[in-house]
Amino acid sequence: MNNERIYQVLKGPVFSEKAQVLGDTAGVQVFKVDINATKLEIKKAVEKLFGVEVVKVNTTITKGKTKRFGRTLGRRSDVKKAYVTLKAGQDVEMADLGDTAESAAE
């Protein structure tokens, strides 16, 4: 897998209460991924990008909602999320957004 495909597969982390609880208790990291990405591609991308060992990958596809824009109906895009279980004792280093917001306010 080349570097370009890695960045196409992993779109970014999911920052939510559920994702944070899973990360703290079960060692699971949650990522938004490409809708066509396979579990094997996701596993290889996380291992290569973050240098951790992946135990398993679970995925979900959330269907986009139908929204009204004036008289016309539109539809939001479908989103695929990957729940990546890491080997015990390993963690993915991500930027803490809370610190940057506080330093920007000063």
Swiss-Prot record:
Gene3D superfamilies in UniProt: 3.30.70.330
Organism of this sequence: Acinetobacter baumannii (strain AB0057)
Protein's recorded name: Large ribosomal subunit protein uL23
Membrane spanning residue stretches: none
InterPro entries recorded: Nucleotide-bd_a/b_plait_sf, Ribosomal_uL23-like, Ribosomal_uL23/eL15/eS24_sf
Entry function: One of the early assembly proteins it binds 23S rRNA. One of the proteins that surrounds the polypeptide exit tunnel on the outside of the ribosome. Forms the main docking site for trigger factor binding to the ribosome.
Top-level lineage group: Bacteria
One GO term (biological process): translation
Gene: rplW
GO molecular function: rRNA binding; structural constituent of ribosome
Subunit architecture: Part of the 50S ribosomal subunit. Contacts protein L29, and trigger factor when it is bound to the ribosome.
Family matches, as Pfam families: Ribosomal_L23
Keyword annotations of the record: Ribonucleoprotein, Ribosomal protein, RNA-binding, rRNA-binding
UniProt record similarity statement: Belongs to the universal ribosomal protein uL23 family.
GO cellular component, as recorded: ribonucleoprotein complex; ribosome
